[in-house]
């Protein structure tokens, strides 16, 4: 385990930063980072051993390539603005008709749920010229540094602007632009994400605790719920569940 400071990979002009977008768009600059890497947020937990093929196959990042239109209903937050900006970058640099013709079997694939394949085919018929968005889970993302470099080469001013914002802004892009770039370019291996589960509130915590104790899924994300919850009670229940499978501290913990 290596401790990395923002000053190790961000330009001086961007420091200090309080923007996850600025950090995300420069993680490929972390000294010593491998070409193939997996990006986790701090609320994501593997709960059973996972093989390398859960993240990379034949050198390609594993991800879900099904098309899923961006939902812009109700209050629009920063992440929705970023998603629209990400999609604009992808559509500016990729011809959907050509990519679907070339990589169609990755966008509609038997590893996905049949309902998702039907939606993708419907979206391809309704919007043949432009990508409308892709399925996003709040889950670890497999990347190559080459993807980040390609996006920087394609949109240097946009990414510089995102990097220099001290706080997240509506005209930023985020790491999804690289994830979606991989999908649009066909540089990915189709992957079923049903073994990734997310969120924690009063209605889901019992199921999450059961999943942890039984280690029935690969990955768990204890995401922030949108509505107010009894945080202390939920945290205690989740902590007990985690301690049932991880009773001892790791060598990195005090």
What are these regions (language model features)?
Residues 27-66:
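GT-A fold catalytic core of metal-dependent nucleotide-sugar glycosyltransferases
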Residues 62-163:
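Long, charge-rich alpha-helical interaction segments
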């Amino acid at each position: 385990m290596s401790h990395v400071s923002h000053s190790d990979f961000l330009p001086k002009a961007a420091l200090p930063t309080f923007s996850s977008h600025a950090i995300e768009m420069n993680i490929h600059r972390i000294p010593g980072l491998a070409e193939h890497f997996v990006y986790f947020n701090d609320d994501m937990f593997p709960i059973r051993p996972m093989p390398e093929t859960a993240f990379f196959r034949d050198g390609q990042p594993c991800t879900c390539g099904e098309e899923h239109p961006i939902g812009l209903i109700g209050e629009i937050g920063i992440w929705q603005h970023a998603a629209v900006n990400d999609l604009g970058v992808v559509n500016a640099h990729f011809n959907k008709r050509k990519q679907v013709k070339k990589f169609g079997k990755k966008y509609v694939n038997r590893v996905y749920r049949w309902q998702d394949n039907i939606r993708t085919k419907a979206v391809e018929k309704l919007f043949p010229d432009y990508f409308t968005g892709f399925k996003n889970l709040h889950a670890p993302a497999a990347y190559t540094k080459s993807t980040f470099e390609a996006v920087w080469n394609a949109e240097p001013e946009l990414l510089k602007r995102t990097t220099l914002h001290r706080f997240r802004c509506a005209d930023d892009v985020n790491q999804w632009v690289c994830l979606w770039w991989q999908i649009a370019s066909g540089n990915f291996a189709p992957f079923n994400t049903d073994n990734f589960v997310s969120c924690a509130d009063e209605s889901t915590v019992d199921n999450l605790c059961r999943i942890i104790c039984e280690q029935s899924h690969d990955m768990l994300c204890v995401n922030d719920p949108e509505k107010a919850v009894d945080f202390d009670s939920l945290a205690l229940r989740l902590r007990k569940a985690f301690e049932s499978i991880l009773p001892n501290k790791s060598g990195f913990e005090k």
